[in-house]
């Protein structure tokens, strides 16, 4: 249909529609659209229909918006406005590739339209189409050479394409156009100079970068960045004396910065340990109260010299009452010799302080205050906890609590000791005690909630967090709004442990949405940073966004989701009623009656909770409606609701698992778990080449990893058994690669070789035992013996590994072995007396963890039981 041109009156109305859209006056814009479209001559005016659709989209009416924009486009295919509007609509739905196509079509009909070019450049940088971004920025530079954003955008395009020299030339040409006095301090010009220097450094032009820095030093506001950069450049250029002077100057600014001491070491190049120590001894004299110059030598000293320096460091900290001293020294615990020296010194302090209130009976000087002994005991509790002696650790912390029962840090450490000893419920109880001492401390509140979640006390954790969340909304919803991912990952783990897979997956998807939001949020910064010239931070932001899903929170959420989907594939959820019928078929009348009572109570409790939840939801909806009515313009539509039941009953769990796996394969290649999870998925999908690829990638990271060994045996065995059904090409590739991985052997021999090579490691023995049973179920007895050995000479004979062995005995990986499991549990209970996992079968916790001792719900339930 040919385009209809508007007469002056309607054209003026159309311009007002554009202004209303720009100023977010959407309802006024719709009125003007109506005035044009109500005229029969212009009822099908393409550009007006498109603008009406765009306005409706901003009011959340998405379907109607798409219909109108498409109708407008059909009526005027040669209109750049219609194509531009269609692109904006696609952009609002995060369909960036489609939006780019629309913008390109718009530019066919108006190639020099600045707004379309700017919008296109934003999408190109968002999608990291760097070649396209460079071309678009070049067009913008040609059209608006006087605008600084045109120059800077073009330079950034070359910088991101790693053509540093070209980027530096463009920035220099632009800098010449800036009229600034050498004595005038201009923040934006200062940032431009620092960005230019960064580009020169990344280009490897260190000499030019140093000259540039010295030339414009007076005009740069960030003096600290100037000095730090100068120090790095002087080191790169081997001007070591000058570099040493710079780092000494930086030390005077901040004697507690570790990096300045490392820089000074590089500049002075000490030949031996004593020369290296001399650097720090000079700092002791200059900064007598400095902790860092006393702490850093402990990393490289040993023997008597280490003991002497450690003695001074510990005395200084214990006298001052410095709680984080253990965390400061934690990295030294990798060295057994240093651990022994630490223990000797601190135990000696405790003995001496008790007898004569001095660190050493031979000391001359004033007596230490009673608090010094407290901090020594506090340290010793953490020390013995770290080296795996919880009983001694508890003795020290209990003594400290008896002397000072109001110090929160003591209760925190007691909770940690119980957690490390395997009793998370007792740990949560003590963390709750700590929280009760200071209910206004948000850190303790969060710590307490975290421990409760680890103990699977989700409701109690939510109540704990509600003390610091917004009133009027539930704590969970508010924490989700605030992107509180530590809470959500812990929640997901707790729900998974309770086999509430739907709820766990909901949390994983909420975390996934946070990362999508963070990626989308960078959109606003593409224009803001150009305008404000915060270019160093902008480039850092872009680099961070590229690897965002490397973050531990995403990895944890993805791991939990993948593990759940693998379980759902292996054991799909069945109808609950059928399960209950099967469970109750063999019960006695008394047991059945007890079960029915329990079910009724659970049903009643669930009903009350549901009513409470609905009431909260209604209240929240009323608040949202009120907010919507008050706010003249509501933008965007609601997100799709995450329903746990639907998430748990997904038809293709492996496909869903792959969605979480893909970012890990791209960004977390260095973690072996990524490739082993990939193997587990492809093994179930029977994708042999992808299984082989996953095993090879994992093998390159850690060839002797226990889980990798299991994967290799399963691949080897499956390939041997099922190779006849594969195509010739796949079979040939498999044969070649398998020979490289395994040599001329069979799965059984390969497993035996692995066992001989790692016979002193408990995790490796467990994996080998699993494979013994997997390859030959008649060898169950030998497999159980291999897994359940608790010899003192074994490495990694820790709580976590022993729990994994017990779980293996229970889950059927070694066949039916309940008797062996019970014997192993009893043996482990002697080794780890506090661990809940190894408590006797009749053992029941006599305490319930609730928020600050409120156990009314538990008392009511107990009364019902009686």
Swiss-Prot record:
PROSITE patterns: TPR, TPR_REGION. Its main location: cytoplasm. Residues 500-866 are annotated as: Interaction with HYPK. The modification N6-acetyllysine is found at residues 262, 735, 756. InterPro entries: NatA_aux_su (IPR021183), TPR-like_helical_dom_sf (IPR011990), TPR_rpt (IPR019734). It holds the Pfam family TPR_8. The keyword Acetylation applies. Keywords: Acetylation, Cytoplasm, Nucleus, Phosphoprotein, Repeat, TPR repeat. Residues 579-642 are annotated as: Disordered. It is found in: Cytoplasm; Nucleus. Residues 579-594, 606-621 have a biased composition (Basic and acidic residues). Cleaved by caspases during apoptosis. The modification Phosphoserine is found at residues 302, 537, 588, 855-856. Residues 595-604 have a biased composition (Basic residues). Signal peptide: none annotated. One of its GO terms (cellular component) is NatA complex. TPR repeats lie at residues 46-79, 80-113, 148-184, 224-257, 374-407, 409-441, 485-522, 672-705. Auxillary subunit of the N-terminal acetyltransferase A (NatA) complex which displays alpha (N-terminal) acetyltransferase activity. The NAT activity may be important for vascular, hematopoietic and neuronal growth and development. Required to control retinal neovascularization in adult ocular endothelial cells. In complex with XRCC6 and XRCC5 (Ku80), up-regulates transcription from the osteocalcin promoter. Component of the N-terminal acetyltransferase A (NatA) complex composed of NAA10 or probably NAA11 and NAA15. Interacts with XRCC6, NAA50 and XRCC5. Associates with HYPK when in a complex with NAA10. Interaction with HYPK reduces the capacity to interact with NAA50. This is N-alpha-acetyltransferase 15, NatA auxiliary subunit.
């Amino acid at each position: 249909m040919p385009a209809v041109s508007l007469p002056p009156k309607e054209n003026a109305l159309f311009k007002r529609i554009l202004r209303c859209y720009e100023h977010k006056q959407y309802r006024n814009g719709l009125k003007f659209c109506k005035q044009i479209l109500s005229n029969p001559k212009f009822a099908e005016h393409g550009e007006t229909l498109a603008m009406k659709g765009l306005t409706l989209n901003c009011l959340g009416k998405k379907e109607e918006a798409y219909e109108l924009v498409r109708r407008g486009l059909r009526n005027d295919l040669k209109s750049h406005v219609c194509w531009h509007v269609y692109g904006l609509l696609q952009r609002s739905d995060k369909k960036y590739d489609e939006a780019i196509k629309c913008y390109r079509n718009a530019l066919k009909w108006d190639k020099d339209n600045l707004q379309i070019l700017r919008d296109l450049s934003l999408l190109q940088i968002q999608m990291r189409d760097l070649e396209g971004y460079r071309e678009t920025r070049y067009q913008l530079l040609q059209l608006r050479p006087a605008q600084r954003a045109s120059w800077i955008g073009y330079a950034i395009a070359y910088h991101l394409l790693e053509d540093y020299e070209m980027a530096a030339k463009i920035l220099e040409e632009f800098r010449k156009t800036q009229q600034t006095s050498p004595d005038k301090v201009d923040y934006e010009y200062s940032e431009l100079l620092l960005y230019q220097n960064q580009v020169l450094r990344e280009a490897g032009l260190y000499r030019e970068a140093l000259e540039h820095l010295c030339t414009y030093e007076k005009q740069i506001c960030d003096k600290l960045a100037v000095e730090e950069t100068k120090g790095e450049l002087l080191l790169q250029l081997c001007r070591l004396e000058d570099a040493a002077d710079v780092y000494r100057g930086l030390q005077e600014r901040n004697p507690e910065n570790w990096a300045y001491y490392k820089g000074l070491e590089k500049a002075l190049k000490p030949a031996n340990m004593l020369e290296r120590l001399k650097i720090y001894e000079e700092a002791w004299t200059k900064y007598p109260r400095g902790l860092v110059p006393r702490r850093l030598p402990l990393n490289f000293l040993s023997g008597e010299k280490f003991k002497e320096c450690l003695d001074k460091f510990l005395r200084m900290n214990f006298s001052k009452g410095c709680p984080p001293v253990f965390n400061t020294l934690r990295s030294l615990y990798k060295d057994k010799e240093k651990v022994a020296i630490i223990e000797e010194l601190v135990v000696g302090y405790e003995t001496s302080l008790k007898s004569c209130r001095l660190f050493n009976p031979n000391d001359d000087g004033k007596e230490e205050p009673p608090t010094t002994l407290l901090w020594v005991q506090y340290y010793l509790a953490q020390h013995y906890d770290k080296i795996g002696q919880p009983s001694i650790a508890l003795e020290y912390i209990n003594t400290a609590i008896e002397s000072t029962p109001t110090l929160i840090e003591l209760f925190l450490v007691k909770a940690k000791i119980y957690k490390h000893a395997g009793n998370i419920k007792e740990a949560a109880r003590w963390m709750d005690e700590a929280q009760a001492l200071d209910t206004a401390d948000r850190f303790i509140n969060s710590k307490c909630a975290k421990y409760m979640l680890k103990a699977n006390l989700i409701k109690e954790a939510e109540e704990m967090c509600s003390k610091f969340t917004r009133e009027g909304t539930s704590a969970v919803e508010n924490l989700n709004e605030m992107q509180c991912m530590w809470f959500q990952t812990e929640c997901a783990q707790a729900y998974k442990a309770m086999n509430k897979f739907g709820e766990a997956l909901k949390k994983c998807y909420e975390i996934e949405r946070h990362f999508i939001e963070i990626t989308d949020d960078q959109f606003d910064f593409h224009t803001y940073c150009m305008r404000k010239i915060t270019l160093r931070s902008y480039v850092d932001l872009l680099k961070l966004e590229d690897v965002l899903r490397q973050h531990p929170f995403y990895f944890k959420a993805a791991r939990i989701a993948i593990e759940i989907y693998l379980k759902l594939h292996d054991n799909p959820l069945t109808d609950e009623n059928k399960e209950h019928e099967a469970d109750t078929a063999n019960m006695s009348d008394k047991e059945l009656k007890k079960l029915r009572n329990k079910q009724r109570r659970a049903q009643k409790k669930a009903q009350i909770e549901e009513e409470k939840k609905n009431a909260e939801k209604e209240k929240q909806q009323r608040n949202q409606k009120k907010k919507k009515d008050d706010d003249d313009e509501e933008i965007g539509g609601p997100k799709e609701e995450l329903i746990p039941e639907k998430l748990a009953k997904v038809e293709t769990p492996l496909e869903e698992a792959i969605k979480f796996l893909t970012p890990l394969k791209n960004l977390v290649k260095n973690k072996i778990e990524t490739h082993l999870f990939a193997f587990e998925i492809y093994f179930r999908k029977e994708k042999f080449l992808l299984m082989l690829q996953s095993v090879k990638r994992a093998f390159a990271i850690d060839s002797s990893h226990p889980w990798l060994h299991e994967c290799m045996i399963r691949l080897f065995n499956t390939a041997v058994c099922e190779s006849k059904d594969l195509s010739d090409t796949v079979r040939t590739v498999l044969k070649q690669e398998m020979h490289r991985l395994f040599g001329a052997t069979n799965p059984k021999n390969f497993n035996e070789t692995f066992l001989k090579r790692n016979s002193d490691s408990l995790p490796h023995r467990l994996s080998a035992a699993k494979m013994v049973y997997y390859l030959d179920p008649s060898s169950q007895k030998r497999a159980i013996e291999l897994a359940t050995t608790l010899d003192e000479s074994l490495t990694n004979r820790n709580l976590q590994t022993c729990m994994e062995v017990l779980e293996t005995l229970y889950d059927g990986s070694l066949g039916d072995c309940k008797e062996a499991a019970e014997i192993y549990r009893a043996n482990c209970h002697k080794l780890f007396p506090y661990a809940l996992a190894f408590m006797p079968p009749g053992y029941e916790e006599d305490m319930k963890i609730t928020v600050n001792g409120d156990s009314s719900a538990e008392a009511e339930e107990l009364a019902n039981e009686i």
